[in-house]
Amino acid sequence: MNTNNKKPDENNINSAQKILILGVGNELLSDEGIGVRTIKAMSKLDLPPEVELMDGGTDGFSLINIIVETDRLILVDCVKGGSKPGTIYKFNIEDAPSCSDKFKTSVHQINILEVINLSELVGKTPETTVIGVEPNSISTSLELTDEVKAKIPRVIELILEEVDEFLKKKIETDKV
């Protein structure tokens, strides 16, 4: 589900850089749905035209084409790192291999980090940041646990900081 109604200025299509905020997870498994719930919360915000929100659900491989077409990817997901429920993790995709022993992202049909790595084989891997939240429960439930639900505002803050940083770098690069 693409939740961005904005279109870039047609005169700036070549210079516009696409930022994809991709929330993944299964809303039927309580905290596993944190990524999707964050995207729904962000859909109410007024975001820059370069930003696209996407509910990736549990799509796995079908996300590859979308990922290779973006310049900046911010992935929001449930991440099991062994810390206290509600702990927020933030790491770059380049750091993911060294984190793989400590972190497990989601329980989808395929690990989303594997999909991002596979995107390199079919095109390019965008600059990627993963923002994850330690789950309290991934049992069958349509509700997030209180510990995880309370973290959505902070996750959104972190996402917006990433967007601002990327757009500032883009402006500086364009000045050169």
Predicted regions and their residues:
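Nucleotide and nucleotide-moiety/phosphate-recognizing core
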Residues: 14-21, 30, 37-86, 90-95
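Conserved active-site and cofactor/substrate-binding residues in soluble primary-metabolism enzymes
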Residues: 33, 37, 58, 83, ...
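Phosphate-binding/catalytic loops
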Residues: 114-176
